């Protein structure tokens, strides 16, 4: 499993909105500038997040985007699944109802299923708020005079 640029940028965009939620609607150009991501690229990600009701859009002057819910309501897993489709480490675990033709005889299937569970459990238990809190704690710990 390799997380694409789209997935990483979607996560960074959501984190930026979480960090600036007190600012109300945030312009895409501001997110792009702070995150050093092309505005055009973010424009491709917005519809994915918007369609799934992760973002609220406001058009016109003072327009922009904001999170629909609190940062603690969004997990890394949910954001990455929107942009990546699935997070399975091997193709035989993809959303295929038939599965692999060797499924019943595969000696490594339990290994891949276990890895898939570890990945899902990890990503589904980290929220945007957790990441922000961790970042702030690390920033305070690294402060020196």
Language-model region placement:
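Short amphipathic alpha-helical interface segments
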Residues: 10-22
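Alpha-helical residues within the helix-turn-helix
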Residues: 33, 50-51
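Short, hydrophobic-biased segments on the C-terminal half of alpha helices
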Residues: 46-47
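Key DNA-contact positions within bacterial/archaeal DNA-binding proteins
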Residues: 40
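Beta-hairpin "wing" of winged helix-turn-helix
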Residues: 54-67
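A short alpha-helical element within helix-turn-helix/winged-helix DNA-binding domains
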Residues: 29-35
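C-terminal regulatory/oligomerization modules of transcriptional regulators
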Residues: 76, 94-145
């Amino acid at each position: 499993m390799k997380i694409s640029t789209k997935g990483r940028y979607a996560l960074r965009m959501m984190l930026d909105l979480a960090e600036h939620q007190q600012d109300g609607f945030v312009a895409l150009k501001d997110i792009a500038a702070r995150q050093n991501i092309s505005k055009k690229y973010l424009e491709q990600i917005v519809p994915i997040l918007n369609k799934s009701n992760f973002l609220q859009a406001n058009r016109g002057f003072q327009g922009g985007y904001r999170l629909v819910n609190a940062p603690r309501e969004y997990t890394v897993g949910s954001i990455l699944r929107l942009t990546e489709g699935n997070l399975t480490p091997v193709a035989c675990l993809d959303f295929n109802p038939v599965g692999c033709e060797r499924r019943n005889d595969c000696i490594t299937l339990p290994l891949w299923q276990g890895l898939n569970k570890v990945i899902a459990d990890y990503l589904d238990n980290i929220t945007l708020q957790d990441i922000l809190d961790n970042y702030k704690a690390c920033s305070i710990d690294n402060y020196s005079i």
